[in-house]
Amino acid sequence: MSETVPAASASAGVAAMEKLPTKKRGRKPAGLISASRKVPNLSVSKLITEALSVSQERVGMSLVALKKALAAAGYDVEKNNSRIKLSLKSLVNKGILVQTRGTGASGSFKLSKKVIPKSTRSKAKKSVSAKTKKLVLSRDSKSPKTAKTNKRAKKPRATTPKTVRSGRKAKGAKGKQQQKSPVKARASKSKLTQHHEVNVRKATSKK
């Protein structure tokens, strides 16, 4: 009897272990893992491109200046130093960034002309166009004064020919009157001579 009891207890223990539910370790899908790994890299690249688009340095921003800009944006630069360097290298290889100085992750970087956002280009164009408009307006504001003075100077010239023409008309009228008056005088003289001759003839006939 002593030998059968332990065997029964052992079989009962094995059956109980089989009945217990086995916990399976859940595995995350591959897509979630890759996404979680890529998110910090994407955020770093976005922050770098934004910092370079805002900067007005023609030569480009150095690595130290980029780190300062990222720290000001709230990014932990000390913990993610290696990620910053890797993202810089990948952006240079993709052609998004241009390395103006240095080699590798050290040196100065700036955005390539193809990747400059349209907003910055439009702002630059607007500023240039606004400056040109101001210059044109200032020139135009000066030019009307000269135009007014020229108009004032031209007005007497327009009035003078009228006076000259009126004077010419008056002279022409006087000349015509003078030309007409000698004819009248001649006609009156001829009439007087005719009357005188008639009177003389009458006197001679009476004699």
From Swiss-Prot:
The modification Phosphoserine is found at S9, S143, S166, S181, S190. It is found in: Nucleus; Chromosome. Phosphorylated in early spermatids. Citrullination at Arg-58 (H1R54ci) by PADI4 takes place within the DNA-binding site of H1 and results in its displacement from chromatin and global chromatin decondensation, thereby promoting pluripotency and stem cell maintenance. Testis-specific. One of its GO terms (cellular component) is nucleus. The keyword Transit peptide does not apply. The keyword DNA-binding applies. Residues 1-31, 116-207 are annotated as: Disordered. Residues 116-136, 148-157, 165-174 have a biased composition (Basic residues). It holds the Pfam family Linker_histone. Keywords: Chromosome, Citrullination, Developmental protein, Differentiation, DNA-binding, Nucleus, Phosphoprotein, Spermatogenesis. The modification Phosphothreonine is found at T159. Its main location: nucleus. GO terms for biological process: cell differentiation; chromosome condensation; negative regulation of DNA recombination; nucleosome assembly; spermatogenesis. The modification Citrulline is found at R58. Signal peptide: none annotated. InterPro entries: H1/H5 (IPR005819), Histone_H1/H5_H15 (IPR005818), WH-like_DNA-bd_sf (IPR036388), WH_DNA-bd_sf (IPR036390). GO terms for molecular function: double-stranded DNA binding; nucleosomal DNA binding; structural constituent of chromatin. It comes from the Eukaryota. Residues 40-113 form the H15 domain. The record marks Q56 as: Important for nucleosome binding properties. Residues 7-16 have a biased composition (Low complexity). Belongs to the histone H1/H5 family. Testis-specific histone H1 that forms less compacted chromatin compared to other H1 histone subtypes. Formation of more relaxed chromatin may be required to promote chromatin architecture required for proper chromosome regulation during meiosis, such as homologous recombination. Histones H1 act as linkers that bind to nucleosomes and compact polynucleosomes into a higher-order chromatin configuration. This is Histone H1t. It comes from Homo sapiens. The gene is H1-6.
